[in-house]
Structures are given as C-alpha cells and as structure tokens.
C-alpha cells in the first residue's frame, strides 16, 4: 500500500482544513517546497497535492508553487483542485505532474471525463468526495445528491483505474476513517486511495488488510499523531 502524504495549498502555504471548512484553516508550513522535501527525505514514494484555492474558485493561483515542488523532488506527484478543463490538465502534465485529479469536473460533466480518460488514460484520477453517502462537489460546498458507491461503479465502467475517495465527515477530525465504505469500494475493480480521517495506526492496518492501493495522510502527520517513516515501513513490511 502506498502512503500519500498530503500537501494542501492555500495562498501558497501548506495548510489543513477541518471538514473542508475554509474558515477552519491551520497553517502547517509556510514553505510547501520545504515540506515536500521533508516528506521525500522520510521515504515517501508518492506526493498528494491539492490546490484549495483552485478547488473553491476554479483558479490555479498556486501553479508556481506546484512547479517549484515538482522541480525540487524526484518522487511522483498527483495534483488536484480546480482542474476543470483540458488546458489545466495539459499544463500540469507538461510540468511533469504524474497524475491529475478531477473532482467537480468529473461529477458535473461525464462526457468530458470520458474524453480525458480516453486521451490520458491512467494519468487521470477521479476524486469522489462524499458526505453521508452522497457525492459533494465544488470544494465540498455543494451536495450533488448522487449515491457515491453507484457513482464509483459508473466511473469503473468508463475505464477509470484510480480513485481517491474522501469521507468529508471524517476529514481533519482525527477520529478515524470510514472503513465500512472502503470495504465496499475495495471489492470493486479499481485502485482505491482512501482519504479522510486516516489518523491512527489502526486505520492503516485495517486498510492494509483490505488490500487497499493507497491512503492519503495529512493532518495526523502534521499533528504528530502518526509518523510517516513508521507508516511507510509498516506498509513495506506488510507487502513482503
């Protein structure tokens, strides 16, 4: 299982939101490039980055930061947040970003998603943010009313290979993750990256037992509740 340490960008700083609330912001590092280097030095194999300004406003105001992070580290990077057209996808891929994560764009416009999957294949990841079993869009602000597991099945039928699934109610709460929903999705034919509330060794161990492809860990690392090096070691030893 791959541990994806998370860098969430807001105003060019590395932050974490609680439950996706832009009014509950905690700055963990004002230098995201330095943070990315720390994660790489601790053994991270893949970095997860989200442009929160982009997710909310559809802009890419943190583009320069993403570029500098890409130039500073050698591990693969996946980037999401406000990517709603092919031009943004192309720009990020040209920059050397390995995977581009679509959220709102995928939920709102399935023909567009199909076109991007046909064109860019496994470089496209879809992020499904769910609240009480329903898909949420626009930086977690709107509820689409779409059943999240049914939507995942639809994405698989379209050829999607990798999915980030976030349980919004759990995100940034340090209360553990929604293992029951991950169990359902893990039975489907898709690489699941679990996100939201991964804050205890127990969560990681349970996700490992389910043969989960990956887990995004953010606040728990910054707050010191989990040690990134230990998590990576646990996963490496489990996979042997």
Question: Language-model segments: what does each one mean?
Answer:
Residues 73, 77-99, 180-214:
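Catalytic cores of alpha/beta
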Residues 28-40, 84-90, 144-154, 204:
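Short, acidic/polar
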